[in-house]
Amino acid sequence: MDAGKKVKAFFDYYGGFEAIIIEHTVFMNSPKTAADLALVQGAILGSAGQSGTKIIGKVSPITWQNYLGNKKLTKDEQLAIRAKNPGKSVSWYKSYERNLRKERTMRLIDVIYDRKIADNDVADACGIGHWSLNNWEKAIGESK
């Protein structure tokens, strides 16, 4: 498994990590995407364990996004998008809304940390980290 070898090399290069927090795989509309994400997460978790990571936590996407201030679009926001872009397919609107929320995450990270992030995956990782630092017990599954 190439992904596992690469991730283990990454962990080993940086001397391992005491803890990692990973985003839950969420099944939305694509079973293939969910399966691919699960495989990648398995490679990450397996490699983390082999490299000595002792604490592995998790968070759902909507949890960290809400905490960051990037809640789901309201009905009014969705209707406004449809009014500005009439006649598009349902998948077009979903894609547009997803991209809008990704842009919001990048802006929020800039506001909170004064860092311009151009890659939405990096911004998501920052958002997960922000939530984790402020909700550590929840992230690792311990209750207060």
State the predicted function of each range.
Residues 1-144:
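Phosphate- and other anionic-substrate recognition elements at nucleic-acid/protein interfaces
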